[in-house]
Amino acid sequence: MSIVKSKIRTIPDYPKPGILFRDITSLLLDPEGLALTIGTFVNRYQGKGITKVAGIEARGFLTGAPLAFQLGVGFIPIRKKGKLPSETVSEEYDLEYGKDVIEVHKDSIQPGDKILLMDDLIATGGTMIAAVKLLKKLGAEIYEAGVIIDLPDLGGRKKLQEELKVPVFSICEFEGH
C-alpha cells in the first residue's frame, strides 16, 4: 500500500526531540488516500462475521466508525476515563511516565461479540493491549486489530500477537519511532 504510505506526513521531533511523528491528517485530507484506506479495511473484514467495531480514542474513531458503517455493524468508542456518560468498565495501563485508564460502556458488548479493534497505529502496544483486556472483560472475542501504521521497531504487534494471541493487520509500516 505504497499509495497510503506516501500520503502520511512525517513530523520530526514531535512531540519531543528524537521522535518521528507519523501524521495521518494528511492522509485524511486526501480523498483517494482515505478511500483506499477504508476500502482496504472493508475488503479485508467483509463477510468475517464481525459483530462490532471498536475504536480507540481518538484516531481509532477516524477509521473505526466509517468501517463499522460499511460493514453494517455497530461502533464502540473506547475512551479515556471520565468521557463516557453511562456505566463503564475500565482498564488501567502503563505509560512512559505514569498510568492511564481507558473505558467502554458496560452495555456496549454482549458475550460472544466478535470485535474488530481499530486504531491509527501500533507502536509499543500498551493502549491496544489494554483495549483488548477491556473488551475481553465483557466477554468479547477479538477477531483482529487493524491499524493504518505499524511501527515494528517498537514491538507492539509482536506483544499483542504473542501475549494476547490477537493478530494485527497494518496497511503500512515505518521504521524507527
UniProtKB/Swiss-Prot annotation:
It is an enzyme of class 2 (transferase). It comes from the Bacteria. Its EC number is 2.4.2.7. Keywords: Cytoplasm, Glycosyltransferase, Purine salvage, Transferase. Pathway: Purine metabolism; AMP biosynthesis via salvage pathway; AMP from adenine: step 1/1. GO terms for molecular function: adenine binding; adenine phosphoribosyltransferase activity; AMP binding. Its main location: cytoplasm. It is found in: Cytoplasm. One of its GO terms (cellular component) is cytoplasm. The keyword Cytoplasm applies. InterPro entries: Ade_phspho_trans, Adenine_PRTase, PRibTrfase_dom, PRTase-like. GO terms for biological process: adenine salvage; AMP salvage; purine ribonucleoside salvage. The keyword Glycosyltransferase applies. It catalyses: AMP + diphosphate = 5-phospho-alpha-D-ribose 1-diphosphate + adenine. Catalyzes a salvage reaction resulting in the formation of AMP, that is energically less costly than de novo synthesis. Belongs to the purine/pyrimidine phosphoribosyltransferase family. Homodimer. This is Adenine phosphoribosyltransferase. It comes from Leptospira interrogans serogroup Icterohaemorrhagiae serovar Lai (strain 56601).
